[in-house]
Amino acid sequence: MHILNYYFTPFAVILILFAIFFSQPEKGVTYLSFGILGAAFALNIWLNRNIYRFLRWSRHIRAVTVWLNLAVSAALFYLLSAYWAPMWLLFLTAPAASAMYMKKWQVFLTALFSCAVMFSLYYVRGLAFGEGGLGTQLWAMAGTQAVFIVFFSMFTAAMAEMVIKVRDSMR
């Protein structure tokens, strides 16, 4: 789990900072985005520092962390995707986190759910901008993004499984 905090959290922060700095959304969107990011960051740090204190609940805490990250990704995607197209990359964080300690079928379902949330938010965004159901090209783009999310998640799960096998073979 700490690996994700070292790589994915800074990536998410950089992605959001670039989205805000280079696209300059409204002040309300900017403040709300920073508020969500700050609250999620603080909660993730607190959970990671206290996971060993609640060792019996560590499995549940990790699952909550995955769903919390997905909710934060969805909120930030909704707020900033109109300004910064790469915001969809936030949907990689929850399935990648689940790949570290969940079974492959759970990772797959997490990735599918993440994709479903992304599709839903694309649709809601399309309705909000009066574009109806978006165009075929945009749905194809979203489909490509969804396929990447699933494949990347399964790749991460396979890598995590391989690391454990190598570790166990050295004992």
Feature names for model-found ranges:
Residues 3-82, 92-95, 114-116:
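Hydrophobic transmembrane alpha-helices and their membrane-interface boundaries in multi-pass
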Residues 17-38, 54-60, 100-165:
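Alpha-helical transmembrane segments and their interfaces in multipass membrane proteins
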Residues 83-88, 109:
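Alpha-helix N-cap/helix-start motif
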Residues 87-95, 148-152:
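Hydrophobic core segments of transmembrane alpha-helices in multi-pass, intramembrane catalytic enzymes
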Residues 167-171:
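Short, highly charged, low-complexity non-transmembrane loops/tails of multi-pass membrane proteins
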